[in-house]
Curated annotation (Swiss-Prot):
It comes from the Bacteria. Belongs to the MnmG family. This is tRNA uridine 5-carboxymethylaminomethyl modification enzyme MnmG. InterPro entries: FAD/NAD-bd_sf, GIDA_C_N, MnmG, MnmG-rel, MnmG-rel_CS, MnmG_C, MnmG_C_subdom, MnmG_C_subdom_sf. NAD-binding protein involved in the addition of a carboxymethylaminomethyl (cmnm) group at the wobble position (U34) of certain tRNAs, forming tRNA-cmnm(5)s(2)U34. Keywords: Cytoplasm, FAD, Flavoprotein, NAD, tRNA processing. Signal peptide: none annotated. NAD(+) binds at residues 293-307.
Length: 656
């Protein structure tokens, strides 16, 4: 509709929602010079961590590094508020290693609010957004069929619950679990986006009127228990092992407070039996809701049903902050009634006398299947309307933050009449995630995983700055100070790699005998330091041990040099694969191609490609329902057709 009301205020970009996606979107837009407003239901819950107060983990830490490399904030705040840091998969290859930080959730939210309040061009407003102001294109007003993907109009602003109108040239929706949010404990439920906070009303209905398809998903969070009532001395202690590692590439953010321990307990036979006896009382198994939950973060009842052969599951007790006794019981989310939850907690070793401060609950909410979005995160139906975070069907603060940055960036570029930026899946986990979201028909909350990327050896966390900071600088997301820091680091890396390629160890050197004595591997003749570093059991720290370094260099430079040299062959092969893929994606497909005649394609791919008639192999890759196997089949078909043409041409020449 075209509003007849006067606008309370006008902005270039409005962001709806103050979670991790919304904060990144608003900050990105404002830092690009756009007059930006962030609307949130509750100013006291900005960037709240309603579930696990932690940042990072496999693939998630890579996302955080990438967001930081593009000027985002999540990595800096995770470093600033970290209670504990650990490197996961430390014994495995660099492609799957991950940094994870337990954070102080209240401090994290407080620091984010301070940043938002002190960012030029950014205003914050507390209000419930219930409607969108749209100007329809001529003859498009009644076109509300979800299957029709062409644009029907463009965004003009938003409307709040109490009737205020705010105009904007672009709007980013980052509503999290608040659209139609309903929390469940057993068979009891109430309208809420999360415990203690009201759900958002009206916006889902508005989106449906505009022709968007919406659906429902669910997630859950475990109980919080009082640290003072847990026998921590009887449990295994998990210490921090990475206080010297950071998410951010900015040295000004390299701060670590006193580290806190986590503790480990396990479920028991009593735990499992109590759950089995009461499955019918949970929202899912009792049939009260049927929304899909996150596959990779299952409830404890899901674990016991799905892994019936296991008689115990590991549970982590994690602090929520320095100034609170609350402990997060990781791996123990449940939908059981509140009166059974304390009994269940007390079956865990060390928690026999625990006090439950907050019960576990499940939350069900509306989302927009992301196939209705462009790869820029702009909606296909409404120009200037963007969507990011859990509203797109993802789960996790890291996934939300990355989408928020992309949506905020592209909303700002739209206002400035610039072309949107698409992150390719081979260039970043951000690109991998968005490509998956907008091209695949996902039916459960999406979590980024290293296994989702075909190029994970290249898309590591340690080189996110090398991959993305030049782009960030070009786009105006990285300032001169950060750019100078980046260039100085690259110079150090290159200089050290050149040195290691030139300098050699000789069999007669004193250190050669020390190396043989400690490793059992002799130095024969002479060997470049680079080739020495390529040995399986040798790391950069060994160069320091054997006095084979000329200067002290930062830890991040050491790691970059070691990975570049040790995995050079693999990296070159993967780069070649990416270049080949880029060339293949440019291959044109014939007009009006009858895909039903290509028997090697899946039935779904034939149907989807027949309708969409993509111009190239790259465009075919963007069609929902077309798999990698289908693309390979198309590539083979193109090669066969090319060979047939050559044969026909040769045959004609012989005939003539």
């Amino acid at each position: 509709m075209i509003t007849k009301q006067s606008s309370n205020e006008s902005f270039d970009v409005i962001v709806v929602g103050g979670g991790h996606a919304g904060c990144e979107a608003a900050l990105t837009s404002a830092r690009l010079g756009l007059n930006t407003a962030l609307f949130t239901l509750n100013l006291d819950r900005i960037a709240w961590q309603p579930c696990n107060p932690a940042v990072g983990g496999p693939a998630k830490s890579q996302l955080v590094h990438e967001v930081d490399a593009l000027g985002g904030i999540i990595g800096k705040l995770a470093d600033l508020t970290a209670l504990q840091k650990r490197v996961l998969n430390a014994s495995r290859g660099p492609a799957v290693r991950a940094l994870r930080a337990q954070t102080d959730k209240r401090s994290y939210a407080h620091e984010m609010l301070k940043i938002l309040q002190n960012t030029p061009n950014l205003k914050i407003r507390e209000a419930m957004v219930t409607g969108l102001e749209i100007e329809h294109y001529p003859n498009q007003i009644d076109q509300k069929t979800p299957e029709i993907q062409e644009r029907i109009g463009f965004i003009k602003g938003i409307k709040t619950y109490f009737g205020s109108v705010f105009h904007a040239k672009a709007v980013v929706l980052t509503t999290g679990t608040f659209l139609g949010g309903r929390i469940w404990i057993g068979n009891q439920s109430m309208s809420a986006g999360r415990a203690g906070e009201q759900a958002s009303e009206g916006l889902t209905e508005e989106l449906k009127k505009l022709g968007f398809t919406t659906d429902r998903l669910k997630t859950g969070t475990p109980a919080r228990v009082d640290r003072r009532t847990i026998d921590l001395d009887s449990l295994d202690e998990q210490l921090s092992d990475a206080s010297d590692k950071f998410f951010s590439f900015d040295p000004l953010s390299w701060k670590s407070g006193e580290q806190m321990s986590c503790h480990i307990t396990r479920t028991t036979k009593e735990t499992h039996q109590l759950i089995k006896n009461n499955l019918h009382l949970t929202p899912i198994y009792g049939g009260f809701i049927d929304s899909k939950g996150p596959r990779y973060c299952p409830s404890i009842e899901d674990k016991i049903v799905r892994f019936a052969d296991k008689d115990s599951h590991q549970i982590f007790l994690e602090p929520e902050g320095r100034d609170t006794p609350e402990m997060y019981v990781q791996g123990f989310s449940t939908g059981l009634p509140e009166n059974l939850q304390l009994e269940l907690l007390r079956t865990l070793p060390g928690l026999q006398n625990c006090v439950m401060l907050r019960p576990a609950y499940a939350v069900e909410y509306d989302y927009i299947p992301a196939t209705q979005l462009e790869a820029t995160l702009e909606t296909k139906r409404i120009s200037g309307l963007y969507s990011a975070g859990q509203l797109n069907g993802t789960t996790g603060y890291e996934e939300a933050a990355a989408q928020g940055l992309v949506a905020g960036l592209n909303a700002a570029r739209l206002v400035n009449n610039k072309e949107g930026i698409i992150f390719e899946r081979e260039s970043s986990y951000i690109g991998t995630m968005i490509d998956d979201l907008v091209t695949k028909d996902l039916k459960e909350p999406y979590r980024v995983l290293t296994s989702r990327s075909e190029y994970r050896l290249i898309l590591r966390g340690d080189n996110a700055d090398r991959r993305l900071t030049p782009l960030g600088y070009q786009l105006g997301l990285i300032d001169e100070r950060r750019w100078n820091i980046f260039n100085a680091k690259q110079q150090l890396i290159n200089q050290e790699k050149e040195r290691l390629d030139k300098e050699r160890i000789k069999e007669s050197d004193k250190c050669a005998k020390e190396i043989f004595s400690s490793t059992g591997t002799p130095i024969k003749g002479s060997l470049t330091l680079a080739n020495f570093l390529r040995r399986t059991n040798i790391h950069y720290k060994d160069l320091i041990t054997y006095n084979l370094t000329t200067q002290s260099i930062p830890l991040d430079v050491e790691e970059a040099v070691e990975i570049d040299i040790k995995y050079s062959g693999y990296l070159e092969r993967q780069k070649a694969q990416i270049n080949q893929l880029k060339q293949q994606s440019k291959k044109l497909l014939p007009k009006n191609l009858n895909y039903n005649n290509i028997e090697t394609l899946s039935k779904e791919a034939r149907e989807k490609l027949t309708i969409s008639q993509p111009k190239s192999l790259g465009h075919a890759a963007q069609v929902p329902g077309v798999s990698k196997a289908d693309l390979t089949a198309l590539l083979v078909w193109l090669k066969i057709e090319k060979m047939k043409k050559v044969k026909r041409k040769d045959s004609l020449q012989i005939t003539n």
